[in-house]
Amino acid sequence: MKGLILVGGFGTRLRPLTLTLPKPLVEFCNKPMIVHQIEALVAAGVTDIVLAVNYRPEIMEKFLAEYEEKYNINIEFSVESEPLDTAGPLKLAERILGKDDSPFFVLNSDVICDYPFKELLEFHKAHGDEGTIVVTKVEEPSKYGVVVHKPNHPSRIDRFVEKPVEFVGNRINAGMYIFNPSVLKRIELRPTSIEKETFPAMVADNQLHSFDLEGFWMDVGQPKDFLSGTCLYLSSLTKKGSKELTPPTEPYVHGGNVMIHPSAKIGKNCRIGPNVTIGPDVVVGDGVRLQRCVLLKGSKVKDHAWVKSTIVGWNSTVGRWARLENVTVLGDDVTIGDEIYVNGGSVLPHKSIKANVDVPAIIM
């Protein structure tokens, strides 16, 4: 089995974190985003994975060598000399994706969910047509492109309606697909969109189906969604009774959904939760309050600080009695002074903040 992950460009929406690492390597719940996806593909029997990128991927190549060995898989980088949108990368990787008759998976690198690849493969083989897209149900379909089925058919797609004014359905494209290699004949090697060009052609030939995703789904490509996705992921681990979570019986855990790396140090009289992820080698002082936040590797939160709806970047320090909230994001190695208030600040790497940030701003 084969899979292609659409990684794309520089991850500008997730800056300042992506100024330090490519977006797929940023840790989501203490594991790089791309590793969540690679593990799910491997579990479904995938042995060849292509990462479609449009910049030199040296950092990722080095990082992923370990996982090639660990899972006995082959990871190749398909580097676009010009951005090829969402369908062009499939054609560029035709040598691998089309090397045999078996179907292949395609997914966006920003999507987090309970990846249903095994079930998707079974469903796809059962209907026997060219492609299947995973769809998720949303409460406000008018913000999205909606998938509409053929009358009298539970899964065959009839059309797509972009940001519908009146209700036509509530299923949207979840950014995960499975195709037979014959789809590659439909795609030219140029910048071309899978959603706007390839899918309508498949629909016209009655060759495209949808598969309903159960459970949570989030595109975590920007900070507010990264935090929301963290909450959804931790809640799903709680539902499954996962051992990855810190037991709610720990005196500092409040409201559950807390994941703390074993190497992190937690001070006295802290209140942590709900929805908090603490990475390796993090140091949390005494009397700290953490809620709906992510502390990345090597960061420090000093005594009595309050951190809410915030991503604290690698090796950053939050001072005593400081208060961070409202989707604040600290890049790598940022220092927030004692008693400083940051309201929705996006702070670039290596900065030191000595004055309050009262309104959301980018601090360069």
Curated annotation (Swiss-Prot):
Its main location: cytoplasm. Keywords: Cell cycle, Cytoplasm, GTP-binding, Nucleotide-binding, Nucleotidyltransferase, Transferase. It comes from the Eukaryota. It catalyses: alpha-D-mannose 1-phosphate + GTP + H(+) = GDP-alpha-D-mannose + diphosphate. Its EC number is 2.7.7.13. Belongs to the transferase hexapeptide repeat family. This is Mannose-1-phosphate guanyltransferase. The gene is mpg1.
